[in-house]
Amino acid sequence: MTRLRKIMLEELQRRNYSEATIRYYIRKVEAFARHFQCSPDRLGPQHIREYQAYLFTKRKLSPGSVTTHLCALRFFYIQTLKKPWSIADTPYPKKNHRLPTILSQEEVAQLIDAASTPFHRTLLMTLYASGIRNAELTCLKIGDIDSRRMVIHIKGGKGRQDRDVMLSSKLLEELRSHWLRSRRKSSLWLFPGNRWHSGDQPIDTKTPRNACQEAARRAGIKKHVYPHVLRHCFATHLLEAGADLYTIQILLGHHDLKETAIYLHLSQRHLHATASPLDSLQLKVWSPQKE
């Protein structure tokens, strides 16, 4: 472990950051240093601005994704190295308020059926069946699956919140098959890392993302599909099936109901259940006027 990595790790742990956030922040700083092929303590705000432009123009990342990179870099330089920089030197990009991508239930089925491996199929099913975040998926442990109460325990989610999400009977059956397929039975992680999925560390967030992209390509789905899309689908399809917003808020782990209310804009059932005011007007049939 390098000196800088050790210092950053200790600072993150001292501030009680979650394991997922710690891994994420360290990876982002390492990627930044690799991009410039230079030790990060020799780089400055101008390099961060150049990197931000690279993430937008070359990597084609969204404003939200670029912001998470900047969060990690700000922590490293301002909190870890105590650089007297103003946050104005590295401003967050303005977010686009667009409605998220949604797949129909038929498209979700096509996506899952097109998974390139049984392991990828299980990842996609778990994301859609539970609505959990990609980072939460990668940190799942075997002991988090409660088949007696039919729930999945999410520990240390966003904001270090614990919560329970639903465990569908179909997903439980799939997870049991996944366990039987494993070459080396992990005693800890539900989805172990490395090539044979038998490592001592969990998969990283790239694995589910690659699973989504590969399955979408094989299924002929032209929409941009990534793990969070399946979370959006979970919430929208629940709403269309009659679930109330408050229940969905709890399952998603949202702090504010306003975050969950966006799915009202995506639900076809709610859109079609509301009549346009034009429909209530008593209009005459148009005919040309004689002069």
Stretch-by-stretch model annotation:
Residues 1-291:
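Conserved catalytic core of the tyrosine transesterase superfamily
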